[in-house]
Amino acid sequence: MEFAEYKDYSPGDEIRHIDWKVAGKTDKYHVKQFEQSTNLKCTILLDSSGSMGYQSPFKKEESKIDYARNLVAGLSYLFLKQFDAVGLTLFNNQVVHHIPPRSKASHLKNILHGLSNFSAKGATAIEDVLASLTEHLPGRSMVILISDFLIGNQDIHKNLKLLRSRGLEVILFQILHPDELNLPFEGDTVFESLEDDTMVGLDPIDIREEYQKAIQEKIDHLKKISNGLGVDYMLLDTSTPLQQALSYYLLKRKSLTKI
C-alpha cells in the first residue's frame, strides 16, 4: 500500500490511520488514505485540438473527440480495475489540462470530469507538446497517445524515439472519421479548417483519388515509424467498435505482465 493523501477524520474511520503529528500541529484529526501498490503507471495524452471535433455534416453521429472520450473512459476503467495508475493530459498546441496518475478506484471520477469539461479547439502541435512533456513523464511507464495525427508529425519520429529511450511503453491510437479516409462528398464543396480560418472550394471528385492516396501514405508513414521504434499503433475510424481498441490494450497489458 502507498500513501496517497489526507482527509478529515469522520466517525467510522480507522483510528490507526490518524496522523498524530499533523493533529498535534493543527488541532484537527486527519486520516491517511492509501492506494494499492500499482503494477503499471500510464499517462493518456489526448489531442483536444479543433480537428478532433470533426463529425459528418450529413449524419447524426459522434465526433472524433466524443469517440476519443469514450475510449479514454474505457481505458481508464480497465487500468483502475487492475489497480494500475492512470492519468490524463489534454493538449492542442500546449497542455490544456493535466490529471496526475492515480490508482484509486475513485480516481475514475476525476478522469470523467476532465473528459466532460473541454471542447475540441485550437491548433495542433504534437511535437512541441511531447518535447515539453517527455522529461516529466515517469520512466518505465506507459504512454497512450490519442490523436488524428493529421497535422505536423515532421518530428514525431524524434519524439517517439525519446520516449522509448526512457523505457516508456508507447501506444498510438490514430482516430479518423470515415469521411477523412474516403472523401465521399459530391458536387461543389467548401472545406473549412477546424484549426484556422482556411477555406477551400472545389469538387471532391477532381481530387478524390489523389487525396485517398495521400491520406493512406500518411497513415503508412506513421505506422512505419511506430513499427521501427517498437511503438504499438492502431488505426481507428469512428465506426470501429470501441471493444476492438480495448481488446488491443488488454493484449498489450497481458504481454507486459509476462515480462
What does each of the following model-derived ranges do?
Residues 107-144, 153-155, 176-177:
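Von Willebrand factor
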Residues 52, 56, 115-119, 206, ...:
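Short amphipathic alpha-helical interaction patches enriched in hydrophobic/aromatic residues
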Residues 1-102, 142-146, 152-153, 158, ...:
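An amphipathic, basic-hydrophobic helix/alpha-beta surface used to engage anionic
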Residues 104, 148-149, 238-239:
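Short beta->alpha junction loops/turns
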